[in-house]
Amino acid sequence: IGAYTVDYNGSTLTFLDTPGHAIFTEMRARGADVTDIVVLVVAANDGIMPQTREAIAHSKAAGKTIIVAINKCDLPAADPVKTKSGLMEEGLVPTDFGGDVECVEVSALTGAGIDDLLGLLVLQSEVLELQANPKANCRASIIEARVEPGTGSSATAIVESGTIRVGMPFICGPYAGKVRALVNDHGERVKKVGPGMPVEITGFSETPNVGDELVEMENERAAKKLGEERQEELRKQRLAQPRKARMEELLAMMGDGTQKAQLKILLKGDVQGSVEAIRKAV
């Protein structure tokens, strides 16, 4: 998932860019969970695809407002009306068809309609009264994680409430940490980042899992104590799972009288999201 900000008429919009390929299902689901407004990009020459239906389902399940960007309207084969008809079959009725779903015809190639889309996003955010308290206890959602040579584990996160600061103790999943450095979406080192903004964080004791929530703690001691408690709970769960799995495998082999060969695979990728997608494909 890519995260970046766009300034438009005095407002700052944060975009989460999720891949459209079929194997990136989990990424799209996480994107729908974290975001406030879903921009559903549909190609005017392709219409409704399986991934489109999936993205609509994720967005509806997360209870998010959907704005449809009908892209590639510059192509001769573009048919926005047919695309809108397809959206109606999925339960999304465009405003010009008497519904409440805003649709904007755009072209990523020529830039046509992009201003209209950005303006609509700003307007919708005002209608929804999207607000966050920068003075609240900091919470951030991990949208990508990796191990960087020389800096160790780092993660990209969206700050959902409060303000994340360098030196802040936190808990993320089962591990405690302390913010060592913050880098904004322009690659600049910063001291703090407020709500709704993407940020790259270093200072994790272990690589966090995508989807984990980072929560500000009162001090490092409290973070470490909570981390140890969560790790112990995970250890107990891991010890219980193998015995159950072995019993299920044994019963399965006894049932059909055959023993199936198992091929163990070690997957490595640049970020957790890539590994997740490859695992799904395999």
Question: How should these model regions be labeled?
Answer:
Residues 74-135, 200, 215:
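Canonical P-loop GTPase G-domain recognition
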Residues 11-12, 22, 33-53, 61-81, ...:
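Conserved Switch II/interswitch segment of TRAFAC-class P-loop GTPases
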Residues 61, 149-282:
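C-terminal effector/interaction modules appended to NTPase cores
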Residues 43-44, 67-79, 104-112, 145, ...:
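G-domain G4 guanine-recognition motif of GTPases
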